[in-house]
Regions:
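Glycine-rich phosphate- or other oxyanion-binding loops that anchor nucleotides, phosphorylated ligands
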Residues: 18-200
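Internal glycine-rich, Lys/Arg-flanked active-site/core loops of soluble domains
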Residues: 15
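N-terminal amphipathic/basic-hydrophobic helices that include classical n-h-c signal peptides
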Residues: 1-2, 198
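Extreme N-terminal starter segment of soluble prokaryotic enzymes
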Residues: 2-12, 54
């Protein structure tokens, strides 16, 4: 168990599944469940009941599409609602959310969110999205939208667990918890977290 102290009561960690952060013990953390509806509902409920939260840090796994390496953690600041791709009406303001970058001298990426596991990257509409998608997941757009509605800062980090192809389900199962150490290191280096030392 990795025990951290959170010195900022206004910061909340959000992820879909506890198996993505199996050893991290700190507070507060919300495990939303998989998919946009579960993610949005769980986060909105928590923010409504805890008005002190001013920043949400989302961590989760994602499939790699372009410009990423499997096994690495990336900051994401652009989020696409992929399930609008078949809509015949142009809805640009509803399709993408962009939040300010927060890490200096670091490229922040673009993630496409949909309610199914992507095993064929050709299904993504590169024409609509301007060929800018780096990653795919199932929650981040919904979380970014909720934070936008509540006026809360949203910092998102995605660990590339698979290549969003026919081998993705097996790769995800194998790698779902592999990014935890990188995320913990990031919390310690960029946020107000520190190790909790056991009393002697």
């Amino acid at each position: 168990m990795t025990m951290l102290i959170n010195y900022d009561s206004g910061t909340l960690i959000v992820t879909a599944l506890d198996m993505e952060l199996p050893t991290l013990s700190t507070g507060p953390i919300v495990f939303t469940g998989v998919g946009k509806i579960r993610a949005a509902t769980a986060l909105a409920r928590y923010l409504a009941e805890n008005e002190q939260i001013r920043r949400v840090i989302n961590y989760g796994t994602a499939g790699g599409i372009k410009g990423v390496v499997k096994g690495k953690l990336y900051p994401v600041n652009r989020f696409i609602e992929s399930d609008f791709r078949s809509c015949s009406v142009n809805l640009p303001n509803k399709v993408m959310i962009e939040v300010p970058t927060w890490l200096d001298n670091t490229e922040h990426l673009c993630c496409s969110t949909q309610d199914h596991f992507v095993t064929d990257p050709t299904e993504l509409d590169d024409v609509l999205y301007g060929n800018q998608v780096n990653l795919v997941d199932m929650e981040s757009y919904a979380l970014a939208y909720v934070c936008q509605q509540f006026g809360v800062d949203f910092h998102c980090y995605k660990y590339v667990s698979d290549d969003a192809n026919e081998t993705a389900p097996g790769e995800w199962i194998e790698n779902v918890s592999s990014g935890e150490d990188q995320f913990i290191d990031l919390l310690l280096s960029h946020y107000r977290y520190s190790h909790r030392h056991s009393p002697r």
